[in-house]
């Protein structure tokens, strides 16, 4: 059977989320936009935010695929396992339109596909999640409740929801389609070279079934296998496929009773090691994150069942503050640290990040 994509990139978190997936996705997409059509997939919902930078613009998305901000030619896809907060979706579409007006005068019509099976969050589902915030440090955004209702066949999905107030407001810039995204993409496969960039949510250490941290986990699988199923994809649909596991030098978990962390640290200790004051706040809840040393045995376990082709190592500047927002490839300490990670995990490091928006290709 003819391949749908020339190449498919899957970017997923190897720890507990907030590994910097957004900036890696932004970098890879930037390499693709001049090669052909780009389909940018996103699953998950408003309980996970992706942050990246385009020039001076700081972009945060919880619903729409981040690559849509890079070029109007990028087709955004919220997959069948997506969970949608209509209010947040509308705000992010407004951010997208405003960004395009600042950068290219709003020129170019763009397409956002929302799978007809994506779940819709209701006010009642939001209310039901209040106990999860106290018990497991959940963001309480209604994602778990909406997913549970979908499993019980009682939830509302995109095909049941009237998106007219949203589509009418942005129809001069964005064509929003509620469709069977799997079938829609298949029909486009003879229209020239196409690439897929798949933006995973959270991290493998939060996976519902395989993390080993239940009940301190999220409401889905955050592994490549789970992400592909949630998008209606498989690597066999592409002539070439590459999965990139994003990890941090100092992993984090959300605040509160969010589950075990090996060798947990204070931000004061991390700041002392880094040589400058660092403290991170969660994208969605705005609470101070928990932080720890890198956990090699946990990463070895994750690699054993997710089998990434490459690693993206972010927050390398936390190991050596001299490379903050700089190219680290000629730095001896950086080379030593990256080599040690490659040897310990028996996986090549292809990308590194050294600060907000600063990503470099370590290996070709």
Predicted regions and their residues:
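Non-transmembrane, aqueous-exposed alpha-helical and coiled segments at domain scale
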Residues: 2-364
């Amino acid at each position: 059977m003819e391949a749908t994509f020339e190449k498919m990139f899957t970017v997923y978190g190897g720890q507990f989320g907030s590994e910097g997936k957004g900036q890696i996705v932004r970098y890879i997409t930037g390499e693709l936009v001049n090669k052909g059509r780009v389909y940018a997939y996103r699953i998950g919902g408003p309980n996970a935010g992706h942050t990246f930078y385009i020039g001076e613009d700081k972009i945060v998305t919880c619903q729409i695929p981040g690559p849509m901000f890079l070029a109007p030619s990028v087709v955004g896809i919220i997959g069948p396992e997506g969970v949608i907060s209509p209010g947040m979706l509308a705000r992010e579409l407004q951010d997208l339109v405003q960004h395009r007006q600042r950068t290219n005068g709003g020129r170019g019509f763009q397409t956002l596909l929302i799978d007809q099976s994506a779940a819709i969050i209701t006010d009642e589902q939001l209310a039901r999640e209040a106990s999860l915030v106290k018990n497991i440090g959940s963001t309480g955004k209604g994602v778990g409740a909406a997913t549970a209702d979908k499993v019980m066949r009682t939830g509302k999905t995109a095909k049941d929801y009237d998106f007219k107030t949203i589509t009418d407001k942005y129809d001069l810039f964005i064509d929003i389609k509620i469709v069977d995204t799997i079938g829609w993409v298949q029909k486009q496969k003879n229209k020239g070279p196409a690439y897929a960039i798949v933006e995973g949510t959270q991290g493998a250490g939060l996976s519902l079934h395989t993390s080993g941290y239940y009940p301190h986990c999220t409401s889905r699988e955050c592994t490549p296998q789970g992400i592909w199923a949630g998008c209606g994809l498989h690597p066999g649909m592409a002539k070439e496929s590459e999965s990139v596991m994003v990890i941090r030098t100092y992993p984090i978990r959300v605040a509160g009773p969010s589950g075990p962390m090996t060798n947990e640290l204070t931000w004061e200790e991390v700041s002392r090691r880094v040589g400058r004051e660092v403290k991170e706040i969660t994208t969605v809840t705005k609470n101070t994150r928990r932080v720890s040393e890198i956990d090699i045995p946990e990463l070895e376990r994750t690699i054993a069942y997710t089998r990434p082709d490459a690693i993206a190592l972010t927050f390398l500047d936390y190991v050596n503050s001299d490379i903050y927002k700089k190219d680290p490839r000629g730095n001896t300490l950086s080379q030593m640290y990256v080599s040690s990670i490659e040897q310990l995990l028996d996986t090549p490091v292809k990308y590194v990040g050294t600060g907000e928006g600063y990503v470099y290709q370590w290996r070709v």
